[in-house]
Swiss-Prot record:
Higher taxonomy: Bacteria, Bacillati, Actinomycetota, Actinomycetes, Kitasatosporales
Organism: Streptomyces coelicolor (strain ATCC BAA-471 / A3(2) / M145)
Main location: cytoplasm
Transmembrane parts of this sequence: none
GO cellular component, one term: cytoplasm
UniProt protein name: Peptidase E
Gene Ontology biological process: proteolysis
CDD domains, per database record: GAT1_Peptidase_E
């Protein structure tokens, strides 16, 4: 498969996709017809226009899958697909409702380049269980696209040792996930991304990532790390830690 999985689409102080623009335009075929999936936000037209503006100078023809009335037809005519960020629960619900969930799996496994950002990157994992988002809607299932066999946590945020906030840190939430599921989780800090080409996966971007596994301490991963071994994991959900 051919995947570009961004932690975020907007970096502080920079424009939409600006921090990853060279990587994005290098990933997409020249002059590509890009099917954009805007369902993670409520205003699909404005969202699509924003993506179109960001990629116009690169000669990318951005087409919202909601435009024209048939999302599946938009996907069929595309040279690549971009699933944008927003609320992951809203996005997954729409993928099920439109039939795009099954169509995306088939198309991407058949060679269609897939780019995700934030919620779109969450969709590439097997399950929605490591999203940061509020469940504003209830999808039919937490099962996402399963393009990679491990979980991803976009926008991964390190604990602040000076914070007086008493809610759970991101690390604590991911440890709770691992108490119930034996599936590795890749924490992608903002500014980082994962590039998958066939059987090879490499960490890219400006910041290191963090890998969580059951029974071991979190491991820091430097930009440029080869993470291909993660493509071979066989995780198990709902295993718990009880004997």
């Amino acid at each position: 498969m051919n995947l570009l999985l961004l932690s975020n689409s907007t970096q502080h102080g920079r424009g939409y996709l600006e921090h990853a623009l060279d990587t994005v335009t290098g990933f997409l075929p020249a002059g590509a017809r890009l099917a954009f999936v805007p369902y993670a936000l409520a205003d699909h037209d404005t969202y699509t226009a924003r993506v179109r503006g960001a990629l116009a100078d690169a000669g990318i023809d951005v087409r919202g899958v909601h435009e024209g009335g048939d999302p599946l037809a938009r996907l069929d005519e595309a040279d690549a697909v971009f699933v944008g960020g927003g609320n992951s629960f809203r996005l997954l619900s729409a993928l099920y409702r439109t039939g795009l969930r099954e169509a995306l799996v088939k198309a991407v496994r058949g060679g269609l380049p897939y780019m995700g950002a934030s919620a779109g990157t969450n969709m590439a994992a097997p399950s929605l269980r490591t999203t940061n988002d509020m469940p504003i809607v209830e999808p039919p299932s937490f099962e996402t696209l399963g393009l990679v066999p491990f979980q991803i946590n976009p926008h991964y945020l390190d604990p602040d040792p000076g914070s007086t906030h008493k809610g759970e840190t991101r690390e604590e939430r991911l440890r709770e996930f691992l108490e119930e599921n034996d599936v590795p989780v890749l924490g992608l800090r903002e500014g980082s991304w994962l590039r998958v080409e066939g059987d090879r996966a490499v960490l890219g971007g400006e910041r290191d990532a963090r890998l969580f596994r059951r029974g071991t301490a979190p491991r820091e991963l430097a930009v440029g790390s080869d993470l291909s071994e993660l493509l071979d994991v066989r995780g198990e959900f709902d295993t718990g830690t009880r004997s």
